[in-house]
Amino acid sequence: MSKKRLYEIAKELGKESKEVVARAKELGLDVKSHSSSVEEAVAAKIAASFKPAAAPKVEAKPAAPKVSAEKKTEKSEPAKPAVAKEEAKPAEPVAPKTEKVAAKPQSRNFKAEREARAKEQAERRKQNKGNNRDQQQNGNRQKNDGRNGGKQGQSNRDNRRFNDQAKKQQGQQKRRNERRQQEDKRSNQAAPRIDFKARAAALKAEQNAEYARSSEERFKQYQAAKEALAQANKRKEPEEIFEEAAKLAEQAQQVQAVVEVVPEKKEPAVDTRRKKQARPDKNRDDYDHEEDGPRKQQKNRSSQNQVRNQKNSNWNNNKKNKKGNNKNNRNQTPKPVTERKFHELPTEFEYTDGMTVAEIAKRIKREPAEIVKKLFMMGVMATQNQSLDGETIELLMVDYGIEAKQKVEVDNADIERFFVEDGYLNEDELVERPPVVTIMGHVDHGKTTLLDTLRNSRVATGEAGGITQHIGAYQIVENGKKITFLDTPGHAAFTSMRARGASVTDITILVVAADDGVMPQTIEAINHSKAVNVPIIVAINKIDKPGANPERVIGELAEHGVMSTAWGGDSEFVEISAKFNQNIEELLETVLLVAEIQELKADPTVRAIGTVIEARLDKGKGAVATLLVQQGTLNVQDPIVVGNTFGRVRAMTNDLGRRVKVAGPSTPVSITGLNEAPMAGDHFAVYEDEKSARAAGEERAKRALMKQRQATQRVSLENLFDTLKAGELKSVNVIIKADVQGSVEALSASLQKIDVEGVKVTIVHSAVGAINESDVTLAEASNAFIVGFNVRPTPQARQQAEADDVEIRLHSIIYKVIEEMEEAMKGMLDPEFEEKVIGEAVIRETFKVSKVGTIGGFMVINGKVARDSKVRVIRDGVVIYDGELASLKHYKDDVKEVTNGREGGLMIDGYNDIKMDDVIEAYVMEEIKR
C-alpha cells in the first residue's frame, strides 16, 4: 500500500496544511508535521472528515449564486418561494436539484461592465488633464524662479517641489486604492478560477502511488521466483540442472525462430509527456495596472504588440525546428543502443616525446579517461591534453603489454646528415673516383705556376701582384685518369680559404721554394693537412735557381713533422721546376700512386652532395657558386639547397667554361639559379623536389638568423672594463665589396686584425658584387668609405658618390688595402702633446694697481718668456698656480717675448697673489707624431 503525505492531502482538499495536521491529530493520529505520511485508507478518512454530514445536505448554498445574481439584476423577491419549495419537499428529490443549480455557470452582465470601464476611462482622462496642467504650472514656476534667482527663489522652488511631491504621492495612493477596489469588485463578479496546481499535484500523487504499487508487486514476484529457484537447485543434482538448462536453451532457440518468422506487432508508443494545460481566461482590463497611472498611447501599444508577436513567432519556429518535436516521431520506437566495439591493443607503439594523453588514446584505441586513471595509479597526475615524456610513455606501454619504440624524426633542413649517414651510399654501386688534390704553400713559392704548367695555360700572368686571389678548381687527365686540382692563396689573409681547401681534399701538394725554405704559411698548410689526416706530397720548387738547397728544405720540414720516405716517414718528396716543366710527370705519377693506395670510391647513383668552393654575384647571371661534387651526380634542373640558400640548377659550366648537363663525383662546376650567393665552405645537397628544397632552405636561413641574433656578447665582470674602454675608441667604418666570397672574408679578417691603439675597424657591410647605389647610400648614412677589391662601381654609384662626398677606394692587391687602412686609422687618432719648458724668470718687485690687479716685475734668468706661453708660479719649490699670461710688457711697450737677461712686467690671468722671489716657469705644448 502506498502512503500519502499530509500536504498532498491538503492540496487535494484545497485546505491549508495546518488544518489537515490539526484534523489528523483530532482523529487520534500520531503526526508531527505536514511532511508526515499516512496510509491511503487513513488519508481517505481524513478527507471524509472535512466533508459535511449527510443529513444537512440541503442548505442555502445552492441558492447563494441565485441570490447574488438577483442582486446584480435587482430582483430579490423570487428567492423566498425557492426556499419554501425546498423546505416543503422531501429530502430525497431535493438533492439532485441542488446539484444542477451548483453546476450552472454564473451569467455576466456585460453591459454593466462596459459602463464601468467607460466611467474609469473618463476618470483617467480627467486625471491626465490635471497632471498636464500641473506640469505646465511647474514649468512656469521654474521659468519664474530662473528669472528671480537668489536664495529666496531657491527656497520657493524647494517648497513647491516638496508640495508637488506630497500631492503626487497622495494622488498615487488614491489611484492605488481605487484600483484595489476595482480589482475586488471584478474578482467578486468573475467566475471562480480552476486550481491547476492542485490538479497537477493530485495527478502526480496518483501516478506515484500507481508506480509504487506496481514496483512493490514486481519486487514480490522477483523474491518469490528467487526463493523457488533456490529451493529447486537445492533438491536437484548437478546433472539434472544441466539437462534442464539444455532443454531451456532448445526451447529458447525454437521461440527465437518463431519470432523471426512471425514479426511482432509493434504497439504505438504511448506519449507519456504531460499535455499542455489550457491557460485560464485572463482579464484584459488589468494590463494598465501600474503605479504611474494611465495607459500608454495607442501607438506604443501597437509597437509592443508587434514585437511580442514577432518574438512568439520566432519561438514557435524554433520549437518546430527542434529535433524530436515532430509529431510524426512520437509514435516511433526508440533506436536500440549500439554496444561499443572492443578494439584489440596493438603489439607495437611508435612514439615521440611530447605526445599528449589524447593522442596516445587515439593510437591505441582506448578512452583518455582510462589512460588518465592508469597514470594516476602510476603516480603521475595528468590530463588528456597534457604532454608526456618518453619515459612515462614507455612505462604506460609496459602496463598495457605493448612494445614501445621511439620514432626517430628526420630534420629535413639538416644537410649534414647526408655526409654522415651510413645507409646513404649503396655499397654495390661504388666506383673509383678521381682524387681531389689541393696545392698549398707560401706566397710566391710557385703554386699557381705549377697549376698553370699542369693545365698548359698562363693563368699566373693574370693574377694581380703575382698572388692568387681566390680558389681555382681545375681538372686534368693523366694516363687516362682524371685529377681535380684546387689552388689556394698563400697570403696570410686567406687562412680560412686554405682550411676549406684542406677539408675537401684527398691529397695535399705542399709547394716549398728551394731557395726560401719553410715559411709561416708553409707551417700553416702543414697544420691544416694534419688536422684532416690528408697525406702530403712535398714539391720542392725552383730547383733551377742558383741558391736552391733542397736538402735544407727537407731538414726544415722534418722539424715540423713532415718526414720523407727516404728518412723513414710517410710523405713523398719530388724536386720540380714548375717554370721549366721539370719532373712534372713524376709528380703526377706520385699523386696517382697515393690515390690508388687510398682506394677512393663514390656512388654516382645517389643524389649529389658536396661543398661550395667559391661564390660570387654576377650582374647578368645573379648568384654564381663553384661546387665540388663529392658523392652522387649533379644534373641540370636539380632542386638544390646550398648552405642557407636554395634554388634549381639553371645552368652548369665546367672548369673550361663549357656548359655541361651532368657532373659526377670529384668534378668542379659553376652553377646558377640560387636565390642568394652562399658562403664559401657551405655544404650542398640535392632534394627530391623543389618544394622540399625551398622549405629546407628557408628553415636553414631562419635558424641562421636566430643564431646570429642570439650571438650577442654579454658583458661580464672580466670584460666589463674592456667594454668600457672600447666605447672610448674611435671607429673607422668600412664597406667591403669584392669579386668572390673568399676575398670578402680575407679582407674582413685582415682589416679587423690591424692593431692601432685607440682606433678600431668596423665592417658595416660586406658582400660580393659591384659597388651599387645602395652601398653609397649606406656609406653616407654610416659615415663610412667603400673598399672595392677586384670590382668597380657602376656609373650611377660613381655619380651618387661624388654628389654625396662618399670616398671609394679600389684595389686589386691585399697588401695595399691593409697599408692604406693603417694610415687612415692613424690619421684618426687625437694628436699627442709633450710639455717643453722655454724659460724661467724671477719676480723682483710687485705693484698693485686698483681695478687692474697685481703686476710683477721680473728678470729672465734662463731662456725666454713668450706672450702665448703657459706659466707656472713656483714658490719654495712648490707649484702654486698654473695658468696663462694676461699681459707681457717691456717697460711700457707690449712685447711678444722677453729674452734672457732682460727685465719686464707681467700679469697672470686669474691670479693676483704674486710675491717677490717667486719663480715663473714658461712652457709650451708641442705635438708628437705617432
UniProtKB/Swiss-Prot annotation:
Keywords attached to this entry: Cytoplasm, GTP-binding, Initiation factor, Nucleotide-binding, Protein biosynthesis
Signal peptide limits: none
Annotated binding of GTP, by residue: 441-448, 487-491, 541-544
Biased composition (Basic and acidic residues): 68-90, 110-125, 157-167, 262-295, 337-346
Location (main, coarse): cytoplasm
Record's subcellular location: Cytoplasm
Residue spans of biased composition, Low complexity class: 50-67, 129-141, 309-318
Region ranges (G5): 577-579
InterPro entries: EF-G-like_DII, IF2_II, IF2_N, P-loop_NTPase, Small_GTP-bd, T_Tr_GTP-bd_dom, TF_IF2_bacterial-like, TIF_IF2
Keyword Protein biosynthesis included in the entry's annotation: yes
Residue numbers spanned by region G3: 487-490
Domain tr-type G, chain residue ranges per copy: 432-599
GO CC terms in record: cytosol
Positions of region (G4): 541-544
G2 as annotated region, ranges: 466-470
Record flagged with keyword Nucleotide-binding: yes
Chain spans, region Disordered: 50-195, 260-346
MF GO annotations: GTP binding; GTPase activity; translation initiation factor activity
Region of interest (G1), residue spans: 441-448
Function per UniProt: One of the essential components for the initiation of protein synthesis. Protects formylmethionyl-tRNA from spontaneous hydrolysis and promotes its binding to the 30S ribosomal subunits. Also involved in the hydrolysis of GTP during the formation of the 70S ribosomal complex.
NCBIfam families in the record: IF-2, small_GTP
Protein family according to the UniProt entry: Belongs to the TRAFAC class translation factor GTPase superfamily. Classic translation factor GTPase family. IF-2 subfamily.
PANTHER family: TR-TYPE G DOMAIN-CONTAINING PROTEIN, TRANSLATION INITIATION FACTOR IF-2-RELATED
Name of this protein: Translation initiation factor IF-2
Source taxonomy: Bacteria, Bacillati, Bacillota, Bacilli, Lactobacillales
